[in-house]
């Protein structure tokens, strides 16, 4: 991933980079891969994520 620095404003470039990384899901992936995840825990996490996505879609449809 690449971020351009304008006017030597490194703080703003870091903020943009962090935003891009979080939107791409890299931070979440790093957190998951930090330690071994048992298959049962993995299934449970995936089910919770799917439920959240479904609820989000339902909220958008009802609005």
UniProtKB/Swiss-Prot annotation:
UniProt keyword annotation of Ribosomal protein present: yes
A GO MF label: structural constituent of ribosome
InterPro entries reported for this sequence: Ribosomal_bS21, Ribosomal_bS21_sf
Keyword Glycosyltransferase: no
Signal sequence bounds: none
UniProt similarity note: Belongs to the bacterial ribosomal protein bS21 family.
Record's protein name: Small ribosomal subunit protein bS21
Organism of provenance: Syntrophus aciditrophicus (strain SB)
Gene that produces this protein: rpsU
